[in-house]
Amino acid sequence: MPVMPIPRRVRSFHGPHTTCLHAACGPVRASHLARTKYNNFDVYIKTRWLYGFIRFLLYFSCSLFTAALWGALAALFCLQYLGVRVLLRFQRKLSVLLLLLGRRRVDFRLVNELLVYGIHVTMLLVGGLGWCFMVFVDM
């Protein structure tokens, strides 16, 4: 989104939006109502590097933030995957032990469904944040 230079006629009007229009021009003097000392592109040239630097900082910080979130969610996904494998092994051993003791087996259906839904949501978030991260890198 490039910065458009404000034409002289618009910059010399002191209406309700004067503070917005003169944000890059410095303080407005009351004795200077009709004309300003700036040419059309002076404001653009003076603020171009600052605008570019602020834009770079914004995109770079957003990219770092989404990359950190992506890494955390990827680690969470790996932990969930390993946790499910350990929990399934525990469930199998517990079920065999309860069968050998002649007791009723425990129903783990709700726990398993919640774990699968949690992994699914984490996987979707990893994919979406990876896409956001690549969008910020491309900018």
Curated annotation (Swiss-Prot):
InterPro entries: TM250. Its main location: membrane. The chain crosses the membrane at residues 56-76, 116-136. GO terms for biological process: positive regulation of cell population proliferation; positive regulation of viral process. It is found in: Membrane; Nucleus; Cytoplasm. Coiled coil: none annotated. It is a multi-pass membrane protein. GO terms for cellular component: cytoplasm; membrane; nucleoplasm; nucleus. Induction: Up-regulated upon HHV-1 infection. Keywords: Cell cycle, Cytoplasm, Host-virus interaction, Membrane, Nucleus, Transmembrane, Transmembrane helix. It holds the Pfam family TM250. The keyword Iron-sulfur does not apply. The keyword Iron does not apply. (Microbial infection) Interacts with herpes simplex virus 1/HHV-1 protein CVC2/UL25. PANTHER family: TRANSMEMBRANE PROTEIN 250. May play a role in cell proliferation by promoting progression into S phase. (Microbial infection) Promotes human herpes simplex virus 1/HHV-1 proliferation. This is Transmembrane protein 250. It comes from Homo sapiens (Human). The gene is TMEM250.
